[in-house]
Amino acid sequence: MSYYDIIFSKHIDKIKSEGRYREFKALKRQADNFPFAEHANKQIVMWCINDYLGMSKHAKVMHASIDALLKYGVGSGGTRNIGGNNIAILELEKELANLHKKQAALVFTSGFVANDTTLASLAKIMPDIVFFSDELNHASIIAGITSSRAEKYIYRHLDVKHLEELLQSVDINRPKIVVFESAYSMDGFFSPIKDIINLAKKYNALTFIDEVHTVGLYGKQGGGIAELLNCSDQIDIIQGTLAKAYGTIGGYITSNHNLVDAIRLTAPGFIFTTSLPPVISTAATHSIRHLKESNEERIKHQEVVTKLKNSFERFNIPYLKNESHIVPIIIGDPIKTAKASNMLLNEYGIYVQHINFPTVPRGTERLRIIPTPAHTDKMINDLSVALVQIFAELDIELSSAKELNEEVRLNLIA
């Protein structure tokens, strides 16, 4: 083993010893049988997929993508500046701007890139800018702010009082921006959006909201929590993804013409990469259009979320209580959490990926349950029964787990 192999091997061994080694599951998704998949030649039920509404297999979306594939081919042919600025992606951006009631939109290869390169670019455009960021913001937000090398203040999670204290400390005439998420993916809590908007206005700050876990799911047309609260027009930059509720891939920002154009001309994550293929852009556009017109998926989704939480209450299964569609079960032990996940998959045919550090803080390791409109009452009951049996086998005390979940909840909303 070479000198460098030893370094890498030690790094891997350390992660394994901490119980947070990640193994990919080889899955064969079944487009005609969502939310089922095949794993190790067995049919399983997926309970952790971010294809929130099953739009990846929706007939309109698949047929549109097939038509685009035959018409345009597989790839986009280049960057947006050199050959890759196709009609399909322009239509997608127009649809996104309309969704969020903004003047313009810009599409990126992923939600991560959209956050990372946009935030870093804002600091290039405004070198004196100050970032104010929620302490539990996504890694992509942290990466963008960090790489910007701009001055930053981190406010306590969801704590608008602390945010105001920090805003007060900076000259009101200095460029500043508050960056936050509408719904936090690991805990499921919503941000106090209107309070943040009011503070930003009071202290002359821009607002940047990450709506990746809410677009398509909330609001009359699927415009996210900002649309639900009727405040999209009061937020300067709305960022979202095409890879979750819309069932495709890609990320985007929406804002006014000048801001979007400035990012288009500045962001390396936009300029120096191949654009989304027309087949993806077309599929995303049709997915957005369908969810603008149809509320059926959202209604059914919320019904299943409620049924799942009610089932957990009946079975005395501890979970982190919130108002969103994300249902975390905090176990607090990386080894037991991984074992519970593997037992669900191998013994019960239920796939729930365990979430360990660094995705969540140590001591809050969890299973994160993601309901979809396609999950049935039987699937909910099977999951509940399996969890009770696995908790007993792993000596996970329900009372202790309940206390841990409540402790985490109180810490998050304190």
UniProtKB/Swiss-Prot annotation:
Any single GO molecular-function term of the entry would be: 5-aminolevulinate synthase activity
Q: Which domain of life is it from?
A: Bacteria
Cofactor names from the entry are:
pyridoxal 5'-phosphate
Classification via CDD domains: KBL_like
Q: Which GO terms describe its biological process?
A: protoporphyrinogen IX biosynthetic process
Question: Looking at the Swiss-Prot or TrEMBL record, what is one Pfam family this protein matches?
Answer: Aminotran_1_2
Gene symbol here is: hemA
User: How does this polypeptide assemble, per the annotation?
Assistant: Homodimer.
- InterPro entries referenced in this protein's UniProt entry, alphabetically: 4pyrrol_synth_NH2levulA_synth, Aminotrans_II_pyridoxalP_BS, Aminotransferase_I/II_large, AON_synthase_class-II, PyrdxlP-dep_Trfase, PyrdxlP-dep_Trfase_major, PyrdxlP-dep_Trfase_small
UniProt keyword list: Acyltransferase, Heme biosynthesis, Pyridoxal phosphate, Transferase
Active site annotation, chain numbering: 244
Sites where the protein binds substrate: 22, 133, 152, 359
Official protein name in the record: 5-aminolevulinate synthase
Q: Which positions carry N6-(pyridoxal phosphate)lysine?
A: 244
Q: In which pathway does it act?
A: Porphyrin-containing compound metabolism; protoporphyrin-IX biosynthesis; 5-aminolevulinate from glycine: step 1/1
Question: Which species is the source of this protein?
Answer: Rickettsia conorii (strain ATCC VR-613 / Malish 7)
Instruction: Check the record and name the NCBIfam families matching this protein.
Output: 5aminolev_synth
Q: Which family does it belong to?
A: Belongs to the class-II pyridoxal-phosphate-dependent aminotransferase family.
Task: Give the EC number(s) listed in the UniProt record.
Answer: 2.3.1.37
Residues the entry annotates as binding pyridoxal 5'-phosphate: 185, 213, 241, 273-274
Q: Does the keyword Acyltransferase apply?
A: yes
Q: Which reaction does it catalyse?
A: succinyl-CoA + glycine + H(+) = 5-aminolevulinate + CO2 + CoA
